[in-house]
Amino acid sequence: LSKYYSINKLTGKIIWSKINTSPFNSEIKIINDKFFVIDQENIIYCYSIKDGKQIWSYKTENFFIKTRKKLSIIINDNKIVFNNSIGDITALDINNGSLIWQIPTQNNQIYADTITLSTSSLVNDQEYIIFSNNKNEFYSLDLSNGFINWKQKINSFIRPIVTEKIIF
């Protein structure tokens, strides 16, 4: 179980408190009156900041062994993009949670490989998504459709740093 709260910053008073059936395992992203989080079952949730009620959720494929690496979420316009513990990158409509695109980055038939997968945080560079993993893969994806722009053989799961024309 995972408990989450809204607390008044000035008084410390709990405004509301809710429970999720599975522990959260991601960054938390906030936009407007909503916040987004992924649990250990690879389900992304959209909650209301006002009262903590679930607005929508979307379940991606899961594996019985849970990752310790925090999953990553980025927001771009009306899209929320995130990774799951088996290497899939998914883009959803931020308002209703409907699928826009999804791309696997691993051969999910080989479960032994996904057990040890560790992915960097996703980096939003305008129309690109940049990320890497510990399986010798460094990606640039097209944010609009999920297509692979390029893939390099670089072994790193540290968050990439993107400048105007260079990635570190």
Each predicted region: which residue ranges?
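Extracytoplasmic beta-rich repeat domains
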Residues: 1, 13-32, 53-77, 98-126, ...
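Short loop/turn segments that connect beta-strands within beta-propeller blades
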Residues: 8-12, 48-52, 94-97, 142-145
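Repeat-solenoid scaffold signature
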Residues: 79-80, 87
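Surface-exposed loop/turn positions within WD40 beta-propeller blades
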Residues: 1-2, 41, 86, 135
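Residue-level marker for isolated small/hydroxyl-bearing positions within beta-strands
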Residues: 38, 82-83, 132
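Structural recognition of beta-strand segments within beta-rich domains
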Residues: 133, 139-141
